[in-house]
A protein has these predicted regions:
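PLP-dependent enzyme catalytic core of the Aspartate aminotransferase-like
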Residues: 231-259
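Anion (oxyanion) recognition and catalysis
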Residues: 51, 55, 182, 218-220
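Conserved PLP-enzyme active-site core in the AAT-like
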Residues: 4-114
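Conserved PLP-binding catalytic core of the aspartate aminotransferase-like
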Residues: 187-218
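Conserved PLP cofactor-binding pocket of PLP-dependent enzymes
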Residues: 191, 195, 221-238
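Active-site C-terminal subdomain of aminotransferase-like
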Residues: 82-181, 192
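Short amphipathic alpha-helices in soluble, non-transmembrane regions
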Residues: 210-220, 252-259
Length: 259
């Protein structure tokens, strides 16, 4: 674990300290995991700087793009989103925002030969003629159902214009909510994506934990699904604006209940 800065991103100074400490203690680090869209606020780590550090130390760079990775396939102007090509591997979950039926999760690697050398054992019942390679040996699972078909169909249905519309509108909904939530009443924690968390000002831990619990219950009764993540030993309320069908009037109704 690495300490994060005030914007919720990985702190490079703390990262270097942590890696150096592990080296002194004889602990071997085989990978550093950067996050493209943190769970609580949708923050994006400084992937380019982390990549340079990983190259210097010969450490594998993996990006957890479960939340924000899908944004990287678009031309949307989002800071740090276009640095995914620096990674050795990345996970992307199209099910989280594009509406692809579960489960739809991808592991993309820059060099598939590494997966082949790691997992392939050779199968006596599969022919090796004509340099044929069984792609089922690229992971721990020997076989998978045709889950890729629903992703392919979903992407074909949306097209690049549709994908960008879905993703861009999610950011606009978060911005609208953030701009209209009472900042005199709440502390806000967000990033460049579609996620925002908030907490009332001036409350101690017990007070805010009780408030978030009761407020979430009351909002659920009004058909608003707001999550309550634990972050830095306190509970927050978190709004995720990935649903394409969420209208401005829906958000205004939520704001009335909060403001």
């Amino acid at each position: 674990m690495c300490i994060r800065d005030r914007d919720g991103c990985m702190d490079m100074i703390e990262l270097k300290k942590t890696v150096d400490k592990c080296s002194i203690e004889g602990k071997r680090i085989f990978a550093i995991v950067a996050t493209l869209g943190t769970t609580v606020r949708g923050a994006i780590d400084p992937i380019d700087n982390i990549s340079k550090f990983c190259n210097e130390r010969n450490i594998w760079l993996h990006i957890d793009g479960s939340i924000g990775g899908i944004f990287s396939i678009t031309n949307l102007s989002i800071n740090r989103i276009n640095n995914v090509h620096f990674a050795n591997s990345i996970t992307i979950n199209p099910q989280k925002i594009l509406g692809i039926t579960k489960t739809s999760s991808l592991l993309i690697v820059s060099n598939t030969e590494i997966l082949k050398n790691t997992f392939s054992t050779g199968l006596p019942y599969v022919s090796n003629e004509n340099n044929f390679f069984n792609r089922g040996e690229l992971g721990i699972q020997g076989s998978r159902p045709a889950e890729i078909i629903k992703l392919w169909l979903g992407l074909r249905f949306l097209g690049m214009r549709g994908i960008e519309d879905v993703l861009n509108s999610s950011i606009k909904r978060r911005i609208f909510f953030e701009n209209n939530l009472d900042t005199y009443k709440y502390d806000l924690y967000s990033g460049p994506l579609h996620i925002i968390s908030f907490l009332p000002k001036g409350m101690n831990k017990n007070e805010s934990d009780s408030w978030t619990l009761n407020k979430r219950i009351n909002l659920l009764k009004k058909n608003f699904m707001i999550s309550r993540p634990l972050f830095k030993n306190r509970y927050y309320l978190r709004a995720v604006f990935g649903n394409y069908n969420t209208s401005e009037s829906n958000i205004n109704d939520l704001l009335k209940l909060l403001n």
